[in-house]
Amino acid sequence: MIVDCHTHVGLAGQHVRGAIHEDLMRTWGRPLWHVPLEEHWAAMTAVDRAIVLAFDAPRVGVEVPNEYVAAYVAQHPEKLIGFASVDPHRDGASDLLEHAITRMGLRGLKIAPIYQHFDPWSSEAYALYEAADALGIPIVWHQGTTFVRDAPLIHARPILLDEIARRFPDLKMWVAHLGHPWCDELIVVVRKHPNLYADMSALTPRPLQLYLALASAVQYNVADKIFFGSDYPFTTVEASLAGLRSVNRVVEGTGFPRIPDEVIEGIIHRNTLELLGIAESAPGARPS
């Protein structure tokens, strides 16, 4: 089974606007984050399951609502799994998360301190971690770099999760994009904590960085804690699979060690949903 653990939906001008839309245009020259639902569905042909992320980051202009994601994944429950997103600054944030999980059928929480403008060690953030822990759902983090100008990198370092993982040892969490450019920092934190994982989404366009991160993961014996993801629409499933399988090309003829084929295929075929505890259907949950 192939699981894409990191995909986005959302329409430019409706869900993605303002500052982040301007920065997308500056960086890519086009509204890259514009994903009609039918395009997302077609893009997931190459995988067996896919996680679809809501995104509640109004401070940078992104609001992909929980309701929108829940209604979409409910159309394809055999394949799609929806994750909620809640800005910790919102009044009643923990209640909003509980509603998204217990009433809408969403299965996890997406948070991004640099886009939601919060300190990962703040009391508001800890209240969300406590709610996720009580609900028994995983959290996916964006802890790494960004093209968005109004996204404070002071909150981006993976090392900030060390204390959180220690305080919540039963809370399953993973960090997107291998925490790049701080991949080694993330890997040593993942090594410490049984409940912490990573995904390699959006790194295949940077093959040297991906190779170095995977080599470090092999050396620290945590390659089995890396999930496959694309970060669609920023990359495609097909390009991510091809880039991962060809990662050793970047060091051909150098004498550097190859990433073993079994490591690469292990990432692609990782039992991600089982490791996160979300392989089974959510009992009693329904979109609302």
Could you say what each language-model-derived stretch is?
Residues 1-8, 13-45, 49, 220-227, ...:
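Mid-to-C-terminal alpha-helical segments outside catalytic/metal-binding sites
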Residues 2, 50, 80-82, 139, ...:
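Hydrophobic/aromatic residues located in beta-strands of well-ordered beta-sheets
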Residues 6, 69, 73, 82, ...:
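Conserved, mostly hydrophobic/aromatic
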Residues 10-13, 57-60, 88-92, 145-149, ...:
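Active-site environment of divalent metal-dependent phosphoester hydrolases
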Residues 12-19, 64-65, 96, 151-153, ...:
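Short aromatic-enriched loop/helix-cap "lid" or pocket-rim segments at secondary-structure transitions
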Residues 18, 107-108, 121-228:
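Catalytic pocket-lining loop regions of alpha/beta-barrel enzymes
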Residues 32-40, 64-70, 93-96, 158-160, ...:
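Alpha-helical scaffolding within the catalytic cores
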Residues 49, 59-155:
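Active-site gating/metal-coordination segments in enzymes
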